[in-house]
From Swiss-Prot:
It holds the Pfam family LIAS_N. Keywords: 4Fe-4S, Iron, Iron-sulfur, Metal-binding, Mitochondrion, S-adenosyl-L-methionine, Transferase, Transit peptide. Its EC number is 2.8.1.8. This is Lipoyl synthase, mitochondrial.
Amino acid sequence: MRAVLELTRRRARNARFARARAVVGARARAADAQELRDDSKGGSSVDKATSTAAEARETAHTLEGFREALRHGPGFDDFVRGDVAYSVPAPKSLKDKTTRKPAWLKREVPGGERYTEIKSKLRELKLATVCEEAKCPNLGECWGGGDGKTATATIMIMGDTCTRGCRFCAVKTAKAPPPLDKDEPANVSKAIAAWGLDYVVLTSVDRDDIEDQGAGHFRETVQRLKASCDVLVEALTPDFRGEKHLVELVATSGLDVFAHNVETVPELQRDVRDRRANWDQSIEVLKHAKKSGAKITKTSIMLGLGETHEQVVNALKLLREADVDVVTFGQYMRPTKKHLAVVEYVTPEAFKRYQEIAEEMGFLYVASGAMVRSSYKAGEFFLANVIKQRKAKEAAAAN
């Protein structure tokens, strides 16, 4: 009699488990079906709504089903006896927080004769570009140039390994990277002269392991470039730990644009950047560069990290107070699953609105769009014209 009762209880438990699993499966299938229907509609105006709504719907359905399955699932005694084979798969939303990319973020695979030429020369001279290291989606477009466009490249000097570990960045990190290549300034100037580029961006990893943090190396590279060819040079620098004499060393090197990125709004600095970097320090770097003689200062902000509209507007006000001339906005793109997840894919309409707000504040130039990066070629085309016009006026005044 006891055996019959135990068998009846076991069958009842298994029936409950089966019903719970069916609930999870049915809700997951319903979410998938709805997502497919949403995808079939297409159109950029609904892409963001589709990606966020589908994610929220899936989270609600799978989490609810998961909790229900656990409520009706086996107890501790069941597992101790070992007579029940049961499992509840974790909901997808708990395992993968990746937000689907909307249609406006798609880019063609880079290629073409100019692209191949530049890539080959980089390998030959053992040079690194942030375009490749940071997996920039605009690589093919920027390296192309031609047809009246400004051909640009962003060369990353001082190695491909950084001493810092910002949570958004794909560049390799180490406490003690390899020593600086003393031939690098000469190789960079040789490569740029051979390519015939109009505008070059020099950037670098952070080198906290070096006494001057690479400021002298940066300065030498700029000076060699300006001496070897007629090219406009933008220096996108690290913060040099806020040491003003090092900032000044680069700012007075003969560059045309001094750039340093604040990366995100003040409120998110600690979550996004390495602990040795912060908003106030970056603002002081930009201020001192202008004070030292840099005629154009520039910075960049990533969007989609969880910032609010009010925080972005406030950041713009602070940048104008620091006399920053150029600001760019771009969509944060998660380089790997080890990096910060994307909180939001900002719509083209929102990017346009931020551009309008910044322009109303008096910035010299604003580039704002999902695929815009701090060294984006459209901005360089504008800056190239601004710089050339200023130089022409200065020459005319001197005569």
